[in-house]
């Protein structure tokens, strides 16, 4: 049993698919690990309620945080509200292996405080255009794993996955990225394997 759970931050712009990815990760990992979730919304607990409605986990394993302001601040400059939620979950479930921390919708400059997140996933979506990876920013360039989501929309919005792949490689260097489609589950296996390997889940 880990003394402290692995904390995985999931960030990205509004509508990129963070909550859908969080739901998919819960479904994929809950049978193997002790798991909990913290979600961030500015004025509501909508994402937490979505996860509860879709039975991602038992309701008591999901805490919705209302940041009441810039979502970036709550995960970076003043992460105290999220750290308190993580601590509450640790007290409630002493044997936790993994806590997913989903940020509110944010911009390309958002990053997680290292106090809050051990690994960061940054989710962008194809419908924002194939130029998005080359716009850079900490999420695109520095996250541990970049998730390029909603690839099924590429032909509908005239986006080139080849261009996105080229620019992601250019902006990220050796850091990995993955194409994903949460509707079909494409890419999920790769994301799960990344979390398990990089987070050393299951290693005594």
Swiss-Prot record:
<comment type="function">
    <text>Facilitates the functional incorporation of the urease nickel metallocenter. This process requires GTP hydrolysis, probably effectuated by UreG.</text>
</comment>
<comment type="subunit">
    <text>Homodimer. UreD, UreF and UreG form a complex that acts as a GTP-hydrolysis-dependent molecular chaperone, activating the urease apoprotein by helping to assemble the nickel containing metallocenter of UreC. The UreE protein probably delivers the nickel.</text>
</comment>
<dbReference type="GO" id="GO:0016151">
    <property type="term" value="F:nickel cation binding"/>
</dbReference>
<comment type="similarity">
    <text>Belongs to the SIMIBI class G3E GTPase family. UreG subfamily.</text>
</comment>
<keyword id="KW-0342">GTP-binding</keyword>
<dbReference type="Pfam" id="PF02492">
    <property type="entry name" value="cobW"/>
</dbReference>
<keyword id="KW-0143">Chaperone</keyword>
<dbReference type="GO" id="GO:0043419">
    <property type="term" value="P:urea catabolic process"/>
</dbReference>
<dbReference type="GO" id="GO:0003924">
    <property type="term" value="F:GTPase activity"/>
</dbReference>
<dbReference type="InterPro" id="IPR004400">
    <property type="entry name" value="UreG"/>
</dbReference>
<keyword id="KW-0963">Cytoplasm</keyword>
<protein>
    <recommendedName>
        <fullName>Urease accessory protein UreG</fullName>
    </recommendedName>
</protein>
<feature type="binding site">
    <location>
        <begin position="12"/>
        <end position="19"/>
    </location>
    <ligand>
        <name>GTP</name>
    </ligand>
</feature>
<dbReference type="InterPro" id="IPR027417">
    <property type="entry name" value="P-loop_NTPase"/>
</dbReference>
<keyword id="KW-0996">Nickel insertion</keyword>
<dbReference type="InterPro" id="IPR003495">
    <property type="entry name" value="CobW/HypB/UreG_nucleotide-bd"/>
</dbReference>
<dbReference type="GO" id="GO:0005525">
    <property type="term" value="F:GTP binding"/>
</dbReference>
<keyword id="KW-0547">Nucleotide-binding</keyword>
<dbReference type="GO" id="GO:0005737">
    <property type="term" value="C:cytoplasm"/>
</dbReference>
